[in-house]
Regions:
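C-terminal long alpha-helix characteristic of the crotonase
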Residues: 1-44, 59, 75-90
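Short alpha-helical scaffolding segments that buttress acidic/His motifs in well-ordered protein cores
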Residues: 29-33, 51-53, 68
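Alpha-helix N-cap/N′ positions at the starts of helices
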Residues: 47-48
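Short, flexible active-site recognition loops that position polar ligands and cofactors
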Residues: 53-59
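Interdomain hinge/lid region at the active-site interface
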Residues: 60-61, 67
Length: 90
């Protein structure tokens, strides 16, 4: 992008990332990226990912699947400030 368009393009990308996405899922993904990059072994990423997949079957995860199947916008109730019980164990 030309320098004068870069900031608006970054804002547009950020908006696409957060629109109709679970705040908890975004926060967990961000933390997984930050923490797993420094992990000593790839198995750590697998363990965290497995727990995150389990969590996806509850709360906002269920709402995300239901809204997709019902072809409607999701209504997420989870807050990034109220992370799941397993966070941050890694």
């Amino acid at each position: 992008y030309p320098p004068d368009e870069l900031l608006s393009a970054a804002h547009a990308l950020a908006q696409r990332i957060v629109t109709n996405r679970s705040p908890v899922a975004i926060a967990l993904t961000r933390q997984m990226l930050y923490r797993n990059a420094a992990a000593e072994h790839p198995r750590v990423a697998h363990e965290v990912d497995s727990i995150a997949m389990f969590y996806a079957g509850m709360g906002d995860g269920k709402e995300g699947v239901a809204s997709f199947r019902e072809k409607r916008d999701p209504v997420f109730t989870g807050k990034a400030s109220a992370m799941p019980d397993f966070y941050p164990w890694w």
